């Protein structure tokens, strides 16, 4: 079976590697088909696509869209999008608005608990000024030794209920799905195990997701346990969703799993790439 990795990030959003470097690493890891899925951003796709062509690696244009649902942030990956689609571009631009103001509020909140200079410090790690986010603040917190690693930065400062967390209203589920579908993409729920939804909440979301045009779910991803692989495989079949596989790789030393280093999908699942 070809080695698919359909979820990763570059410096166009919050990854550590430039798009071409990311593709190079994927090829070195034996990835056959790679999707670049930066947060609400498609500016890295052309560079990645060009390097993939040079290396003979099949490249899939993608994006990870931020959605607000039930008071939490949920991510939906769009695969096989057309980056030139105007409606997609406008939708992503609308979603990106407000990140800068949110970052200022995060910095002010961190300063109130004795962590000064976080906005300037976070921007040191930002390649795309439109895409400042929590991961950039996390890297600053690691650099200044407030925490030992990025995961700890999120746990202690950057998730709901912690001093550096600022909620933000992203796209609605309907608008996020419409944005992806306008660009011809396949909407796939990213890392469902990360949202801490109850069983009934997850089933409610998947029903709305499917009814709104959602088509797939990440069954195999770096943040899932073996038990969750099985749990989301069952839900994929129950809701008639295509199954996806993606590392959510952000960079060396920060990600649990490297590009392409994932278990295969179970044989009874219909993969998202089935009709490609």
Regions found by a protein language model. Name each.
Residues 51-207, 263, 267-276:
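Extended substrate/RNA-proximal surfaces in nucleic-acid metabolism proteins
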Residues 87, 254-255:
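A short acidic, helix-capping loop that chelates divalent metal ions and anchors anionic groups
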